[in-house]
Amino acid sequence: RRPPRSTLDRSSAASDVYKRQTPEQKEQWLKPLLNGEIRSAFAMTEPGLPSSDAKNICTQAKLEGDEWVINGEKYYISGAGDPRCKVMITMVQTNPDAPPHKQQSQILVPIDTEGVHILEGMEVFGHDDAPHGHMHIHFDNVRVPKENMLLGEGRGFEIAQGRLGPGRIHHCMRCIGQAERALESMKKRANSRVAFGQKLSDMGALRHKVAEARIKIDQTRLMVLYAAHKMDTVGNKAARKEIAMIKVAAPRMACEIIDEAIQVHGGGGVSQEFKLAYSYGSNRTLRLADGPDEVHLEAIAKAEFRKND
């Protein structure tokens, strides 16, 4: 078994707890998270629903006295299989009669709470990513203190939007790193393999592939740096188009370069002997995670046509 895919690592409660919780909850969760003593998961996706539209959340939380009672089902919850995972930020519907973007809330749910049932893990391109996992979870009358709600009732969609921008930039940074690793592996292989009396690295076609890969990596790196700079200087909302652009460009670029590296490695490239096949699956998954390409392309198109309004 391989270590968990870094691109699917969603142990990301720390930033939300830091920004949106009480001093007591920071003491309980933030310190051990930052110290690496525990892990966390973000539970939003549900079976049978388009996860790119968070307004469709069906898992419900109802306030009974001083407790929220949660019932529902979550799917593809990355990190929840890790025995170190101790808490989930869970997206729930708290008021179905509110305006669409105010129906959802986010609640801290300790993973050992009675009624939390972690079912089977899912395989991604044949890998189970144990122990990290991508889990199917049932919430059956799960009770947590009302203080576990983040920021306040009806602000779940707002929190989700605020956390996705930085998260997408992090994903794209990792895409660049994996593309760099694939390029290094491709050059090393080309320097060590001789075919028909000639090193692969001396063949013009392959040399051009290496050059093209370098251009693509550096183009994407500059796009990512610009998006990160814009988010830092003018904010997440103002950088929305640039973040959407890199979320499409970076995984595509990484997949292209890893695919070329696989080709240079021959049969070994798709075997367990190298990390390329696993890396390809990881980056291909990112064309779906945190919003599929189509959603981001539509956001980019809207921003472009808005210029002419």
Could you tell me what each predicted segment is?
Residues 15-20, 42-43, 97:
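Flexible, glycine-rich active-site loops centered on histidine and acidic residues
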Residues 20-25, 32, 36, 54, ...:
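Alpha-helical interface subdomain recognition
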Residues 67, 71-119:
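A short core secondary-structure module
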